[in-house]
């Protein structure tokens, strides 16, 4: 590791990690499509943290916008069951680093290690629902809920992470977004006109996986994915088929043999280790018609959640998220300036809070200098 002014550099998995001297003892913990995550020790607080490197965020306007969106969301969404932003900085190589509290594991790793006992399945489902209630109240859809995006610490506290694909509530949304196993059928059928209900479908898939210890709908491709969904739910109802806009998709659905649904009580009859209420909630989550699917607010009042449900401790977001930037088609340099400005604002806000608490925040002047440079000052 070599020092470079305020930053230190090290090679991890062949990738340069260039972070401020505030963070030491880097160890890789995960690699994703958009970045590398390392654990580290925050010398300012003594806490263990996760440092996520977003690789080449300014290489294209699409990547720059995606990173800007994730930053804005992390700054806006503040809830016990959502990952929070502790620090953010841009390195001299212009990579962006997000810093969060380090969680012990994620649900994907937990499910691969051992079967979950029923009380953990119930508690994790409750916390996911509680977080989604807050997210949806802000006018945000996560769009990529899956076990690897659900972080869990040693106290079984759960936090939803990875808002890179999150979008606003918009009846005309399009795109091929969530990981296939957890993807709602309306995304596969229409690729548009979907809403917060797509997240509840994902919760259903996750709940089923916690119950059985394996993915419920392990599709090899989206055709196979849809086919195995119909094996459980039966053929989609006519009003769902009527929403299909693509002629090719419509022909595909109409070509499938008619299937009758399998009752959930029959399909999950062997799952005697969980309460019948869990299977009832599952049946209300995994519904073809999104308008008939249970919402996060409704899910929290379901009998399966009774042990944890507390209407006085299930907050909503104080304000809707501002999506005004989302349709902007801007050059990379503009996104860069906007990003620096957001980072500076974050450090100034944190700095005021830390001054109140008697600690210091060292990075705001660095970011001000970077912003001046980005603006050509």
Curated annotation (Swiss-Prot):
Record's comment on post-translational modification: Dually phosphorylated on Thr-174 and Tyr-176, which activates the enzyme. Phosphorylated in response to oxidative and salt stress.
Entry binding sites for ATP: 29-37, 52
Active site: residue positions: 144 (proton acceptor)
Modification Phosphotyrosine, positions: 176
Recorded catalytic activity of this chain's protein: L-seryl-[protein] + ATP = O-phospho-L-seryl-[protein] + ADP + H(+); L-threonyl-[protein] + ATP = O-phospho-L-threonyl-[protein] + ADP + H(+)
Residue numbers covered by motif TXY: 174-176
GO biological process, one term: negative regulation of filamentous growth of a population of unicellular organisms in response to heat
Coiled-coil regions listed in the entry: none
GO cellular component: chromatin; cytoplasm; mitochondrial intermembrane space; nucleus
Modified residue annotations for Phosphothreonine: 174
Cofactor(s) essential for the protein: Mg(2+)
Domain Protein kinase as annotated: residue spans: 23-305
InterPro entries, per database record: Kinase-like_dom_sf, MAP_kinase, MAP_kinase_CS, Prot_kinase_dom, Protein_kinase_ATP_BS, Ser/Thr_kinase_AS
Activity regulation details: Activated by tyrosine and threonine phosphorylation.
Chain positions covered by the region annotation Disordered: 354-377
One MF annotation (Gene Ontology) recorded for this entry: RNA polymerase II CTD heptapeptide repeat kinase activity
Cell location: Cytoplasm; Nucleus
Functional summary from the UniProt entry: Proline-directed serine/threonine-protein kinase involved in a signal transduction pathway that is activated by changes in the osmolarity of the extracellular environment. Controls osmotic regulation of transcription of target genes. Regulates stress-induced production and accumulation of glycerol and D-arabitol. HOG1 is also involved in virulence, morphogenesis and oxidative stress response especially through its role in chlamydospore formation, an oxygen-dependent morphogenetic program.
Family note: Belongs to the protein kinase superfamily. Ser/Thr protein kinase family. MAP kinase subfamily. HOG1 sub-subfamily.
Record's comment describing the protein's domains: The TXY motif contains the threonine and tyrosine residues whose phosphorylation activates the MAP kinases.
Protein name, per record: Mitogen-activated protein kinase HOG1
Species in which this protein is naturally found: Candida albicans (strain SC5314 / ATCC MYA-2876) (Yeast)
């Amino acid at each position: 590791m070599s020092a470079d002014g305020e930053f230190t550099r090290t090679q991890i998995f062949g990738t340069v990690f260039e972070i401020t001297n505030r963070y030491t003892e880097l160890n890789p913990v995960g690699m994703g499509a958009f970045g590398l995550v390392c654990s580290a020790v925050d010398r300012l607080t003594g806490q263990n943290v996760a440092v996520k490197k977003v690789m080449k965020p300014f290489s294209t306007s699409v990547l720059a916008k995606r990173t800007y969106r994730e930053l804005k969301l992390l700054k806006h969404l503040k809830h016990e069951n959502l990952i929070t932003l502790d620090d953010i900085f841009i390195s001299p190589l212009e990579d962006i680093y997000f810093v969060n509290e380090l969680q012990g594991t994620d649900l994907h790793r937990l499910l691969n290690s051992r079967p979950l006992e029923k009380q953990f399945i119930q508690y994790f489902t409750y916390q996911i629902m509680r977080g989604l209630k807050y997210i949806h109240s802000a006018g945000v859809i996560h769009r990529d809920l899956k076990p690897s995006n659900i972080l869990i610490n040693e106290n079984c506290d759960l936090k939803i992470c990875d808002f890179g694909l999150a979008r606003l509530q918009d009846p005309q949304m399009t795109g091929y977004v969530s990981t296939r196993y957890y993807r709602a059928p309306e995304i596969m059928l229409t690729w548009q006109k979907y809403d917060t209900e797509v997240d509840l479908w994902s919760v259903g898939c996750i709940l089923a996986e916690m119950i059985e210890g394996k993915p419920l709908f392990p599709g090899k491709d989206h055709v196979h994915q849809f086919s195995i969904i119909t094996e459980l739910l039966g053929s989609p109802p006519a009003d769902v088929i009527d929403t299909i806009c693509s002629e090719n998709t419509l022909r595909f659905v109409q070509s499938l043999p008619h299937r009758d649904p399998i009752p959930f009580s029959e399909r999950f009859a062997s799952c005697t280790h969980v309460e019948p209420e869990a299977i009832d909630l599952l049946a209300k989550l995994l519904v073809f018609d999104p308008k008939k699917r249970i919402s996060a607010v409704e899910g929290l009042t379901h009998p399966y959640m009774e042990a944890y449900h507390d209407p006085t401790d299930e907050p909503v977001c104080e304000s809707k998220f501002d999506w005004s930037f989302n349709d902007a088609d801007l050059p990379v340099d503009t996104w860069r300036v906007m990003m620096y400005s957001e980072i500076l604002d974050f450090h100034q806000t944190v700095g005021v809070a830390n001054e109140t608490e008697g600690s210091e925040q060292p990075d705001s002047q660095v970011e001000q200098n970077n912003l001046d440079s980005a603006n050509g000052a």
